[in-house]
């Protein structure tokens, strides 16, 4: 049912719609906005459900998931990969969040982690994205959520701008996202960085 719900609630580009918010509740992309982070989790969910469907010998559902995952994968590849990182997403007005030339918040942690965890990123993409995370987001206390923090260029749904730079959702460090980046680095064989 969760797959069907998401397939019935897609944004303008065909990725899962933001509805209220994704994991980052200070990032409001709008009801029809789209989160790359959620799209990558959805991609991974389809991989897992295909294993269950194979166990049940449900070839029709496997075919449905294969087709849906292939379509979603093409969208993520075409819309969300930005040279050396995956963008954060799209507002419902079509604004791209987290692209390389954004003056603020142009590098986000969670899409990079989940591109690797989901198995979506190619080896080259995974290594480029994780290098950006290591170079730009890593601190002695853990990886920050994004860089640079919001200050003057936040979009309307960037509620993180109410917090000082480096605190909470405005480039703070969150325990959940640490587990994800540790897993992503470990999956790429970067035990020293994990």
Set out the residue ranges of the language-model regions.
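Aromatic-rich carbohydrate-recognition surfaces in CAZymes
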Residues: 1-14, 35-43, 126, 171-194
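Catalytic cores of carbohydrate-active enzymes
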Residues: 41-158
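Mature extracytoplasmic enzyme cores
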Residues: 1-21, 28-41, 45-56, 64
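Short linear capping/connector segments at secondary-structure termini
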Residues: 20-24, 91-93
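Beta-sheet entry/capping signal
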Residues: 13-17, 84-85, 114, 193
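Short clusters of hydrophobic/aromatic residues that line enzyme substrate/ligand-binding pockets
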Residues: 15-18, 86, 146, 163
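Solvent-exposed loop and edge beta-strand segments that line ligand/cofactor-binding
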Residues: 26-39, 94-118, 160-178, 183, ...
């Amino acid at each position: 049912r969760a797959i069907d719900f998401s397939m019935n609630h897609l944004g303008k580009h065909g990725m899962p719609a933001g509805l209220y918010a994704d994991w980052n509740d200070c990032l409001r992309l709008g009801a029809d906005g789209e989160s790359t982070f959620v799209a990558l989790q959805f991609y991974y969910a389809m991989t897992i459900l295909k294993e269950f469907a194979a166990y049940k010998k449900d070839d029709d559902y496997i075919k449905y998931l294969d087709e849906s995952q292939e379509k979603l994968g093409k969208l993520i590849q075409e819309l969300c990969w930005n040279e050396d990182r995956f963008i954060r997403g799209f507002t419902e007005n079509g604004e791209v969040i987290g692209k390389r030339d954004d003056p603020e918040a142009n590098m986000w942690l969670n899409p990079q982690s989940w591109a690797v965890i989901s198995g979506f990123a190619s080896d080259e993409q995974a290594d480029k994205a994780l290098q950006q995370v290591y170079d730009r987001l890593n601190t002695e206390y853990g990886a920050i959520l994004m860089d640079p923090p919001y200050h003057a260029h936040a979009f309307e749904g960037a509620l993180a701008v109410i917090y000082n730079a480096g605190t909470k959702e405005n480039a703070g460090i969150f325990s959940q996202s640490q587990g994800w980046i540790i897993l992503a680095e470990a999956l790429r064989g970067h035990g020293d960085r994990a």
